[in-house]
Regions:
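Bacterial N-terminal signal peptides
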Residues: 1-7
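Glycine-rich, highly charged phosphate/nucleotide-binding loops
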Residues: 20-21, 76-102
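Solvent-exposed loop/turn segments at secondary-structure junctions
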Residues: 44-48, 78-82, 110, 114-118, ...
Length: 286
């Protein structure tokens, strides 16, 4: 009897068992399990709406479907740029997790937006962590250098902001890194709208793949950057992740050119981790 009472007292004084950790809601079943997923975002609510955006999104989706390297998910809003579960709204779905995917589902983002953007501070933190900490990919299209211009950390991630642009015209290019997949056979003259960059751009922070040939620029054009540094396509590592920026695609036509499509496809593959390339920053590779 004494032993029984002592045992009861011990049981009454024992510390409660720790609470089980909260279980994060699971997303819907994955119909593309085992395949790379690319989130294509063209949120231009606060910026210039390039007429080529619809064609660009369709081309990116088509390249993934035809090559089999990735599945593209097309959005014209930024809702999915979050690490939080996505819940619905309205009478039917309010407070319920819906089948929209958050960043956990994707392997890279292809960003075609422009302007100051609609991201909340938490979404901005989630986007940076998606690349820097999670080791995912970020591909920026033509207008990505004029997006989020009041967000310094974004400019640091992509390598710089656009300072201005030349009118659409044929210009001469130098293939700076012919070993980067898709770059070797790019034509040395190509018609598009070319940009020139400003801070935080620094050639020591990026690996240039294609650039304008400064020897073929007019004095007026060269005055935009007297150092003659006019990158057109570049790549860089950002933390554990990969960033690939191409400024091609102001109009529809470049998206139909095999050389541009090949360059974008190979950039996507690299950002997804399907291929490797040396992206040592320019000043360190000399």
């Amino acid at each position: 009897m004494a032993v029984f009472i002592a045992g009861c007292a011990h049981a009454q004084n024992a510390a409660p068992a720790p609470a089980a950790p909260a279980v994060r809601p699971q997303g819907p079943p994955d119909p593309y399990e085992g395949r790379k997923k690319l989130l294509v975002v063209a949120d231009v609510q606060t910026g210039f709406h390039h007429n080529s955006i619809s064609h660009a999104m369709a081309t990116i989706e088509q390249m993934g479907r035809e090559s089999g390297f990735y599945v593209a998910f097309l959005r014209t809003d930024s809702q999915l740029i979050t690490s939080e579960p996505i819940v619905g709204s309205g009478a039917r779905y309010a407070g319920r997790q819906i089948n929209a995917r958050n960043l956990d589902y994707f392997d890279a983002i292809f960003f075609l937006g422009s302007g100051e953007g609609t991201l909340t501070d938490q979404q901005k933190a989630d986007l940076l962590a998606f690349v820097h900490d999670d080791g995912k990919g970020f591909i920026g299209g033509h207008a990505s250098t004029v997006a989020f211009y009041n967000w310094p950390e974004y400019g640091e991630m992509i390598g710089g902001f656009m300072d201005g642009e030349f009118p659409v015209q044929p210009m001469q290019l130098i293939v700076e890194d012919p070993d980067f997949p898709g770059a070797r056979d790019f034509p040395t003259t190509f018609t598009d709208q070319y940009q020139f960059l400003k801070a935080p751009y620094d050639t020591g922070d990026v690996h240039t793949i294609l650039r304008l040939d400064p020897a073929r620029l007019t004095a007026e054009q060269l005055a935009r950057r007297p150092d003659g540094d006019f990158p057109v396509v570049w790549a860089r590592n950002y933390g554990r992740g990969r960033v690939y920026i191409s400024t091609f695609g102001h109009l529809d036509d470049p998206w139909d050119q095999p050389a541009v499509r090949e360059l974008y496809l190979e950039g996507i593959k690299w950002a997804l981790g399907l291929t490797d390339a040396d992206v040592t920053p320019d000043t360190q590779s000399q």
